[in-house]
């Protein structure tokens, strides 16, 4: 955390699946002062609120989240009950206050509905729109992907030869593309997945660890899935799962310009037999995930909901719009042209796809 200067601070954190935690405090001589915790959580006994405030007062403004949580926990009586939040949630809220983090309500949001593009254009557009948000030329944006041809999108740091079977890819006409974010490979055919990208200022996740930022940025998705009758959660670090199996995975890229990309692919109706012919899913990864078969690891949304892909997309768009007041927009011609240039100079070049052979 960067050095916290003296002055008033306000921080908020909505616990994924839990309650809102708010803190107002002063920083005096590098230490927390006049700390006031509030929120729509439940806490027993009443006196515990004052105990939490007292535990925070006097802490160094450079304290880590772990140190803050430990201070709160050590001050609480054994019979204290925290419902909808935790000492860790308090620590995150304090860190966000000290970092002068922004909240969802501080921004005007835009939604780009599914727009058909080549997969090369999609990964290039991710970089373009993140740069546009960083430059202030575009509001924070949620964009849904649409594509026609089968593709594999590998993570920025994955080995091409270790992740993709070239014979299988050629046999099934699969294009291999490398994205700018880390994480694992995505197998995508027309209509078989739901993919979206979020382009946000990093201030939105200031004070959050990388692990905490994933469920924080996808709380609206969990609400969407709940509306569809699916109880889903994050399985650290970046898998989205239900009690019937994995349904998706997320990846992030934080740009030096101050923006970040967060994107998710969820399986809708995957051809698992074809997937295992194209992707080389290592035994080590399957073992770590507690399963022996790649085909059994993924449980598509179509089977779990019985709904069309369009119905699921409509629910997701509606949920995000209602939750954050987002307005529909499109991709400008200038953004399209910049993406085309990036495809030609970077994303469709042998140097990029083979950057990790």
What spans do the regions from the language model cover?
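Active-site- and interface-proximal helix/loop "cap" or "latch" segments in soluble metabolic
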Residues: 17-100, 301
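N-terminal lobe of the biotin/lipoate ligase/transferase fold
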Residues: 96-208
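A generic structural motif
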Residues: 39-43, 200-206, 272, 304-307
């Amino acid at each position: 955390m960067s050095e916290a200067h003296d002055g008033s601070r306000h921080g908020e954190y909505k616990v994924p699946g839990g309650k809102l935690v708010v803190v107002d405090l002063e920083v005096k001589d590098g230490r927390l002062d006049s700390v006031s915790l509030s929120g729509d959580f439940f806490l027993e006994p009443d006196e515990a609120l004052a105990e939490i405030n007292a535990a925070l007062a006097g802490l160094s403004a450079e304290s880590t989240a772990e140190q803050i949580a430990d201070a709160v926990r050590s001050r609480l009586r054994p019979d204290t009950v925290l419902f909808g939040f935790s000492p860790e949630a308090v620590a995150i809220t304090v860190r966000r206050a000290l970092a002068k983090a922004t909240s969802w309500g501080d921004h005007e949001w835009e939604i780009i509905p599914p727009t058909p593009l080549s997969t090369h254009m999609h990964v290039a557009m991710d970089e373009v729109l993140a740069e546009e948000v960083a430059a202030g030329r575009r509001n924070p944006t949620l964009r849904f992907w649409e594509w026609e041809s089968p593709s594999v999108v590998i993570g920025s740091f994955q080995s091409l030869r270790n992740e993709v079977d070239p014979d299988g890819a050629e046999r099934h006409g699969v294009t291999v593309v490398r994205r700018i974010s880390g994480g694992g490979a995505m197998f995508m055919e027309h209509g078989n997945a739901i993919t979206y990208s979020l382009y946000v200022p990093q201030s939105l996740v200031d004070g959050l660890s990388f692990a905490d930022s994933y469920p924080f940025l996808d709380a609206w998705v969990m609400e969407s899935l709940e509306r569809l009758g699916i109880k889903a959660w994050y399985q650290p670090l970046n898998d989205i799962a239900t009690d019937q199996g994995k349904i998706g995975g997320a990846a992030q890229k934080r740009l030096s310009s101050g923006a970040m990309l967060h994107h998710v692919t969820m399986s809708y109706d995957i051809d698992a037999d074809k997937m295992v012919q194209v992707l080389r899913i290592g035994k080590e990864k399957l073992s770590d995930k507690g399963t022996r078969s790649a085909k059994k690891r993924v449980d598509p949304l179509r089977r779990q909901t019985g709904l069309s892909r369009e119905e699921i997309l409509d629910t997701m768009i509606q949920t995000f719009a209602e939750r954050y007041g987002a307005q529909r927009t499109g991709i400008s011609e200038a953004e399209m042209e910049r993406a085309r240039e990036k495809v030609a100079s970077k994303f469709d070049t042998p140097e990029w796809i083979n950057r990790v052979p």
